[in-house]
Amino acid sequence: MEKFEREIKESKFSELLNKHFAASAIPKGIHCLSLRLTDEYSSNAHARKQLPSPELLPLLSDNSYHHFVLSTDNILAASVVVTSTVQSSLIPEKIVFHIITDKKTYAGMHSWFALNPIPAIIEVKGLHQFDWLTRENVPVLEAVENHKGIRDYYHGNHIVGSNLSETTPHKFASKLQARSPRYISLLNHIRIYLPEMFPNLNKAVFLDDDIVVQRDLSPLWDIDLKGKVNGAVETCKGEDTWVMSKRFRNYFNFSHPLIAKNLDPNECAWAYGMNIFDLRAWRKKNIRDIYHFWLKENLKSNLTMWKLGTLPPALIAFKGYVHPIDPSWHMLGLGYQDKTDIEAVKKAAVIHYNGDSKPWSDIGFEHLRPVWTKYVDYSNDFIRNCHIMES
């Protein structure tokens, strides 16, 4: 019986590992879309037209508009975030989207939004176009990308060889999720530099690329953050005992003396993915420096303080600067919790497919995918030619 149980457990771990590798791969259709749109940028003047048009440029820093920031190299995901936000808005003409992408995706991303106009103001910028964003100003990120321990962490064989008898499938799944290569991408750390990247903005909502907006988000700008910097949904209380049971002890190694000395294991965690930031209040704090300090300390400790991811250093850096907002604004777990309540999904302002099972991937949960796919235009020539099919 013991042998049988061990085999079942090993089978479960193997399934989770395969799922992790599948989630890390770029689907062929999405890769094709990026390549074709990049080619279009080279050959089609319409794909290169200025975004936004010259007369609208002043609105990029107009604080009477609602500014959203999205950082991604996934063109299809970006289109869903933007389309769902605009279609759910009561005043789409007041929306400004600042889409940040990397150098290799820039041409394709620009092509998509130039050729598929929507009733909002769109700006597409590559990381290479931010003069401020140099290695001198963000030296820690070069260290993160080049650190041997991190390369081993993502590419070594120790994941497979870890002692499975000392963990559970639940914990193993969490560890794998933290091993996503996107966590060492500059695009994923970019949100910590919002005040410098957008020096004229007072407030902005930062959205992850694996979300869908289902409700008008303009009331977020009316929330009194009471002098705090980050309006976020807390994740330590709620009916879902897996998704909504996160405290600092779930993210940090409290056997490390620096962690034990500075943090409370019972402190409530909060979510990235849909955050309203008061950039004026943020500029008066040293949040970025704290973030850098703890990233460096974790590297020095050979990743023994936490197992990577961008949330742990943010939990420390924003400590004392978070204002909890109503949980209905942001529903989490659609990428790793297949038992998600569909009725609850319908009521949430923003649903978040955080986890491995992204709606654009083959391992997305079938019953949760239609909420995302309804914002994809499957009649679009580029999408059809890349064989991105509605499932």
What is each stretch, according to the model?
Residues 1-391:
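Glycosyltransferase catalytic domains, chiefly GT-A lineage
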